[in-house]
């Protein structure tokens, strides 16, 4: 299973092609659009999300509500393109026209791809870099993840997310499954403890007033995974490695951990390893879940707990020092329309990126041409955990 996205932030559309989805999977576009809507929400978002109304159009790979087993193409229209039609159009324009529209960027933003991308691809107008490196591309990745969540639901696998920390204000590290799911999306910062939600909003408002931005930590939980997905045999087949690669590929994400993560370094092994238990109903299970559902690069049947660290967004309304690439003179960095905090939205993006990593691993573990075949193999693996 793989996918390819295309499109620029202010171009006409984002396009994604997904290959490897089994045939006969029931897909309702409204289920995908429900997930797309979640990405647009969250306290601290900028004006762009007031313009866009992200919805997906499926243009191939699905017929009469069911997947065909062929590549699935989805399109997300950029409504904001109407304001950028000439500057982002395909037809050539003169340097004078470009200058008059004041859209040329020569002052790279610290922490963004602007300068290095310009060097690498020889772009003197850094807009050519930021249009593709923008987090707008994550809308396409959420569409992919939403499709994967439809698949996972058919396998009785649940995946959900929350915000753990914003700007140093922290929620509890872990919640039991029932509390977690009962409190999803109860507030606009996506935190479980409603008592700290306002403190987070205040922190975001403070950053916005100061022309600054703040980051945070998000958490994704995957429940009811069959055991043994992934592998200890080769580095590139380890499930935690694959999830980690996906998470740190999200714009502005700078760290990932599983279960107790970096806190494991502070504790003895006797407090971190999860004891193996058995009963005839569950089969093998663990007495705790410090390791976040992963051992030896494989799922162990416990909830997979993924923590992702998002740095503050690099576009600042109180810009940092930079250098004009044409004159080499000191300037303040370019200001682009941006969010003061995108952590709540990033939790949704992270959830869908993890959903793809899980779905991809399952389809490699249980190679299946159609959904019925996949379901049967999952049932057999779950039974193995009891009978082994």
UniProtKB/Swiss-Prot annotation:
SUPFAM superfamilies listed in its UniProt record: Chorismate synthase, AroC
Binding sites annotated in the UniProt record for NADP(+): 39, 45
Encoding gene (name): aroC
Biological processes annotated in GO: amino acid biosynthetic process; aromatic amino acid family biosynthetic process; chorismate biosynthetic process
Organism: Staphylococcus aureus
Organism ancestry: Bacteria, Bacillati, Bacillota, Bacilli, Bacillales
Protein name in the entry: Chorismate synthase
One Pfam family, short name: Chorismate_synt
Alphabetically ordered keywords of this record: Amino-acid biosynthesis, Aromatic amino acid biosynthesis, FAD, Flavoprotein, FMN, Lyase, NADP
NCBIfam families per the UniProt record, alphabetical: aroC (TIGR00033), PRK05382.1 (NF003793)
Subunit structure as annotated in this protein's UniProt entry: Homotetramer.
Catalytic activity annotation: 5-O-(1-carboxyvinyl)-3-phosphoshikimate = chorismate + phosphate
PROSITE patterns (UniProt xref): CHORISMATE_SYNTHASE_1 (PS00787), CHORISMATE_SYNTHASE_2 (PS00788), CHORISMATE_SYNTHASE_3 (PS00789)
């Amino acid at each position: 299973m793989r996918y390819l996205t295309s499109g620029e932030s202010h171009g006409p559309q984002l396009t994604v092609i997904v290959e490897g989805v089994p045939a006969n999977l029931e897909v309702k576009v409204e289920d995908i659009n429900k997930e797309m809507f979640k990405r647009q929400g969250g306290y601290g978002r900028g004006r762009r999300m007031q313009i866009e109304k992200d919805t997906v159009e499926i243009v191939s790979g699905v017929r009469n509500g069911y997947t065909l087993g062929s590549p699935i193409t989805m399109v997300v229209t950029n409504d904001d393109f109407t304001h950028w039609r000439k500057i982002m159009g395909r037809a050539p324009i003169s340097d004078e026209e470009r200058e008059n529209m004041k859209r040329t960027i020569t002052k790279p933003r610290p922490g963004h791809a602007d300068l290095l991308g310009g060097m690498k691809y020889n772009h003197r107008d850094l807009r050519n870099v930021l249009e593709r490196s923008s987090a707008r591309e994550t809308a396409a990745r959420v569409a992919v993840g939403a499709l994967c969540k439809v698949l996972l639901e058919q396998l009785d696998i649940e995946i959900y997310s929350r915000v753990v920390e914003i700007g140093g204000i922290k929620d509890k590290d872990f919640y039991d499954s029932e509390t977690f799911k009962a409190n999803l999306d109860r507030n606009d910062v996506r935190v479980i403890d409603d008592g700290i939600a306002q403190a987070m909003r205040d922190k975001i408002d403070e950053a916005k007033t100061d022309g600054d931005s703040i980051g945070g930590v998000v958490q994704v939980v995957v429940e009811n995974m069959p055991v043994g997905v992934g592998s200890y045999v080769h580095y590139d087949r380890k499930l935690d490695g694959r999830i980690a690669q996906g998470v740190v590929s999200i714009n502005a994400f700078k760290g990932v951990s599983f279960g107790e993560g970096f806190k494991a370094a502070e504790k003895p092994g006797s407090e971190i390893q999860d004891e193996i238990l058995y009963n005839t109903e569950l089969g093998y299970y663990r007495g705790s879940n410090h390791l976040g559902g992963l051992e030896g690069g494989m799922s162990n049947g416990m909830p997979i707990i993924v923590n992702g660290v998002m740095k503050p967004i690099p576009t600042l309304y109180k810009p940092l020092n930079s250098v004009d690439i044409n004159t080499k003179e000191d300037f303040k960095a370019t200001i682009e329309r941006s969010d003061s905090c995108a952590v709540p939205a990033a939790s949704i993006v992270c959830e869908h990126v993890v959903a793809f990593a899980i779905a991809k691993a399952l389809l490699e573990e249980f190679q299946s041409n159609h959904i019925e075949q996949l379901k049967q193999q999952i049932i057999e693996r779950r039974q193995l955990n009891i009978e082994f």
